[in-house]
Amino acid sequence: MKKYFLLSALLAALLLLPAALPAQDVKIGVIYPFSGPTAQIGLDHRHAVELVMDIVNTDKYKNWNLPLAKTMGLPNLKGGKVSAVFADHQGKPELGLSEAERLITQEKVTALFGSYHSSVTETASTVSERMKVPFLNAESSSPKLTQRGFKWFFRTSPHDETFSEGMFQALKDLEKKKNMKFQTIAVTYEDTLYGKDSSRIEKELAAKAGYKVVADIPYRRGATSLDSEILKLKAANPDVLFPTSYTSDAILLLQTSKKLDYNPKVIMAQNAGHIDPSFVEAVGKDADGICSRAEFSLDLIKAKPMLKEINDEFKKRTGGRDFSGTSVRCFVGFLVLCDAINRAGSTKPEAIQDALKKTNLPPDQLVTPWRGVKFDDNGQNILVDALVIQYQDKVQRAIWPYNLAGAEMVFPIPRWAERK
């Protein structure tokens, strides 16, 4: 009788214990342009996101020193897997907004990620802010995005102020090295938030550096002709040209420069279209000599050896396309978001928001040339640095800062008539 009583008591106690919790899978809404003029950017970013999910969900890459590479799934969510719901904004801000709403209300995603175009990120993130869902941005560079007082928006990469400061410092360092002085600059830019912010910052930095702005030329994004803009630049004849363009515009800008024999001594581009692999595929060796701020160059492999293996894996998925400055930032950003969700140990928005605020990733766990990832109160990563590349033989070579450089800057850019 006593044994029966003890057994009954034991069974009753076991019934009171909570059942083993199942793995908590995580669904993230990913908003990029998968059609339209910048579709290739979106496709490359999809490959970057899928590579991160493979790193997180399997142990195939456990030898890589990356967050979550050594485990299968999210360990703090019982091995839960990460999946993505991809949405196409086509480069349209209003579509980015509606897709963000759909992903949150219908797809029930845990967080949002995207969206490349600053103008689209601006609208899509207003939805996540209103609905209190974390939004991580990896590559949109308008400074205004982290100056809105938002509590649910986080950006891992530098903004245009950081990037532009790096480009102007690269020019100052070149002046010292060559014992010369630039006098004039010109800015030309597409007419959305990205271009307007970029040109504003460049003009402010030019004034501080003592450079005169001799031309300020906006153009309509997606323009079919840039002849008049190039003729104005040719007449102004600046020492340095600062273009801010998406891919199709960057291609047209260079082709028109060649057609009209416009020969700037230095071209210092604001990333985006000028570092998209589709750009050099379209223009070939005509790209040689162009400089751009960037976050990736194969020259970084010397400082970060694991980058070669990761880039090789990325190339398998893209049909031979290397990481670009934007796709590598997408890779890092999505990994940061997955790491934060794991540290949150929950799919609740408030827990993920808190984990993002506490992010403090060291540089050795990144494939970008940053000092780490740590967000300020505005959601901006404060441990970012700029890199400047130059096309040489159709390859993006790191030329600044000098401690990361893999090549000397070619200066001035050879005139069209001098090229072979």
Where are these regions (language model features)?
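Extracytosolic ligand-binding ectodomains
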Residues: 4-11, 17, 22-420
